[in-house]
Regions:
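Helix N-cap motif at beta-to-alpha junctions
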Residues: 222-224, 272-274, 352-358, 400-404, ...
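Short glycine/threonine-rich beta-strand-turn micro-motifs
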Residues: 160, 344-357
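Interdomain boundary/hinge elements
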Residues: 34-38, 145-156, 191-202, 237-250, ...
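Conserved nucleotide-binding/hydrolysis modules and their immediate coupling elements
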Residues: 200-302, 312-314, 475, 484-534, ...
Length: 595
């Protein structure tokens, strides 16, 4: 049976998972109507792919291995690894929005590897769809990225993903995805390898099974694999022995145990507990290892601590230091971009590839019943030959023209350098190079500045010399000086001073941050104070209390607004901000000592 290996790449929410699900339904791999590829609860909720997924379908006596890749830059190294194991990519582009920054990031990687993409212009049923313009923009993007003449001669398929329809031209009367599947068979080269050569494979992804332990997922580059003794080689040439105890292949979204597999196929193997991404599994100790896979370095770091607030242990099922450590160790088995330093007894230092990367880990933990607190995220600073280096990002922004001045001014203050600006209809596309510090906590402000109409995407560039101090608009914190239930009367007086994070009847404790002040100074407040009652009759009827809706705290929003003397307290049902030192007098004394 012939094998085709493809990946699906696209910007967040351009429809790649929807198309994959439709392909699986129409080839009979799954029957239910629900979204199947984004299996993680968070992925379904946010509508984004976080982990690359493997699936296989059978069509016209051909096995097609499909990898659904993440579209967010925080998960970029997932994408890069996957591209090494496939022969073509389906580039899914929204017919209205055209190619977006994340598309650019993944596409550049695939063109550099010599892959010839098939372009799928999706969502052609949108009222504002512009499929021809989107196709032109894709061609221009290919040119920009230095595509070869052969790569520029790409095949285009038009699609309505949610209805499961694909067309070779816009006026085709197609009712299903047959045109797309036929195009894959015609244009994607069949997987080739030498079946008689000694076996070699390189894992591009890791999985975990409670019974089998760490699982390695990869493509067999050559030879045939069976259970038994193997050698594992690091890219440096270091060799150790291992043993394959079980092997699986993918059928639909389920895995099927097999006894052997040949070159070109994608398999999952169990039995090598310390296997890592980029290592080569081979039959002979003197075989050449496959080229190393580069994994993006972490750019931000923060501390995970046991929750010690007055409300600790109320909601969480797993609250101890040991339980948090075990959960982080389990995460390290599969989350390659994550690094954890367990050397300090008081906290665990967790480093990741961006705010979203870490926020998703914390969100998953709280849903599983964990309770913890985290410190303010900090950018990782390196030192090389006596110079401080910090991570820089390329930020691409699409905004209506009237907001461009504000964005340029704001990012200028945050040490951003504009490298490109071009009008696109009523929108302007701007590209900046900016220190990661400059965009930590900026997304929320960006949505306010563009009234929700802007699109913001970033990707890691490199470590560069430290850009110096960054001026940000400082807000102070309103910290409760008492414990109890917040009253509407008190909150109504406080809301004039800034933005509140809590509503009436919320339980608070001393040192809990209940809002921020427009001025830069912290303020100790009493949110439980009621109205003084007297036996005097008031001269007029009491005015009704009107509370402005408060700002709901999420993990990402907490990252944006927290100060360096605060913790974000995360429990299964609540996200709260608190001062590290809860008592106001002790806080003031500590502040004086610092000064």
């Amino acid at each position: 049976m012939e094998i085709r290996n493809i990946a699906i790449i696209a910007h967040v929410d351009h429809g790649k998972t929807t198309i994959t699900d439709a392909i699986m339904r129409q080839t009979g791999m799954v029957t239910e109507e629900s979204v199947t590829m984004d299996s993680d609860a968070l992925e379904k909720e946010r509508g984004i792919t976080i982990y690359s997924k493997n699936t296989s379908i059978f069509y016209k006596d051909t096995k097609i291995n499909i990898v659904d890749t993440p579209g967010h830059a925080d998960f970029g190294s997932e994408v890069e690894r996957v591209l090494r194991s496939i022969d073509s990519v389906l580039l899914v582009v929204d017919a209205q929005e055209g190619p977006m920054p994340q598309t650019r990031f993944v596409l550049k990687k695939s063109l550099e590897l010599g892959i010839k993409p098939i372009v799928v212009i999706n969502k052609i049923d949108k009222p504002a769809a512009r499929p021809e313009i989107a196709q032109e923009q894709v061609f221009e993007l290919f040119l920009d990225l230095g595509a070869s003449d052969e790569q520029l001669d790409f095949t285009v398929v038009y699609a309505i993903g949610r209805e499961g329809i694909a067309k070779r031209s816009l006026d085709d009367d197609s009712k299903d995805l047959t045109p797309l599947l036929d195009t894959i068979l015609e244009k994607v080269p069949a997987a080739t390898s030498n079946p008689d050569a000694p076996f070699r494979m390189q894992p591009f992804s890791l999985g975990y099974d409670n019974f089998l332990g760490r699982l390695a997922i990869g493509r067999i580059h050559e030879g045939t694999i069976r259970s038994g003794e193997v050698f594992v080689k690091k890219p440096t040439g270091e060799v150790r022995k291992g043993k394959i105890i079980k092997m699986f292949t993918f059928e639909g979204i389920s895995r099927k145990e097999i006894s052997q597999a040949s070159g070109g196929d994608t398999v999952m193997i169990a039995g090598i507990p310390d296997i890592d991404i980029g290592e080569t599994i081979c039959m002979e100790a003197d075989q050449e290892p496959l080229p190393a896979i580069k994994i993006d370095e972490p750019t931000i770091t923060l501390n995970f601590l046991v929750n010690d607030s007055p409300f600790a242990g109320r909601e969480g099922k797993f609250v101890t230091s040991k339980q948090i450590k075990e959960r982080l160790e389990k995460e390290l088995e599969v989350n390659v971009g994550l690094k954890v330093d367990f050397s300090n007894g008081d906290y665990y230092k967790v480093s990741g590839r961006g705010e979203l990367h870490i926020a998703i880990l914390i969100e998953n933990m709280r849903r599983e019943g964990y309770e913890l607190q985290v410190s303010q995220p900090q950018v990782i600073i390196k030192e090389e030959s006596g110079k401080k280096l910090e991570p820089f990002e390329e930020v691409t922004i699409d905004v209506p023209e009237q907001f461009s001045g504000t964005i340029i001014e704001t990012l200028g203050k945050r040490k951003g350098q504009m490298t490109e600006m071009k009008p696109e209809g009523t929108q302007v596309r701007m590209v900046f190079e900016i220190p990661t510090r400059g965009i930590l906590g900026y997304r929320n402000q960006f949505m306010i500045e563009t009234r929700g109409e802007g699109i913001f995407a970033s990707r890691f560039l490199e470590f560069r010399p430290h850009a110096g101090a960054i001026s940000k608009h400082a807000t102070g914190s309103m910290a409760s000086m008492v414990a109890g239930k917040a009253l509407a009367f008190s909150l109504a007086n406080l809301q004039d001073r800034g933005v509140l994070y809590i509503g009436a009847n919320t339980e608070v404790y001393e040192g809990m941050v209940i809002g921020n002040t427009a001025k830069g100074n912290d303020m100790a407040v009493n949110p439980i104070k009621g109205k003084n009652l007297t036996n005097m009759r008031s001269s007029g009827a009491d005015a009704a209390i009107h509370l402005v809706p408060h700002m709901e705290l999420t993990i990402e929003r907490g990252f944006e607004i927290m100060a360096d003397d605060e913790y974000l307290e995360v429990t299964p049902h609540s996200v709260r901000l608190r001062k590290q030192i809860l008592n106001e007098t002790q806080r003031v004394q500590a502040g004086r000592k610092k000064a």
